[in-house]
């Protein structure tokens, strides 16, 4: 019984080792997924957030005024959507 457990463990460890070696050699050959992910998540200067004169949703509004469509929450000091009880 112990001998069978040891042989199963060694077989499983061998399969894991074989998988790791195959994966490492394949990842060296193929850089396509890495290149694809880097091109998808590349940050372009056109998409960077601009500094505005007004504060957007959930931004602090003590020093800045909230943008149109938002009101400054008196409790949290954040720009939030206007609700019927805040008007």
From Swiss-Prot:
Superkingdom of origin organism: Eukaryota
Record-level Gene Ontology MF annotations: ion channel inhibitor activity; toxin activity
Residues that make up the propeptide removed upon maturation: 25-52
TM helices/strands, residue ranges: none
Cystine pairs: 54-67, 61-72, 66-79
Keywords linked to the UniProt accession: Disulfide bond, Ion channel impairing toxin, Knottin, Secreted, Signal, Toxin
UniProt entry tagged with the keyword Nuclease: no
Keyword Disulfide bond: yes
Any Pfam family matching the protein: Toxin_12
Principal location listed in the UniProt entry: secreted
Tissue expr: Expressed by the venom gland.
Leader sequence residues: 1-24
Gene Ontology annotations for the cellular component aspect, listed alphabetically: extracellular region
Subcellular location field: Secreted
Known role: Ion channel inhibitor.
Domain note: The presence of a 'disulfide through disulfide knot' structurally defines this protein as a knottin.
Family: Belongs to the neurotoxin 10 (Hwtx-1) family. 51 (Hntx-8) subfamily. Hntx-8 sub-subfamily.
Protein name (record): U3-theraphotoxin-Hhn1q
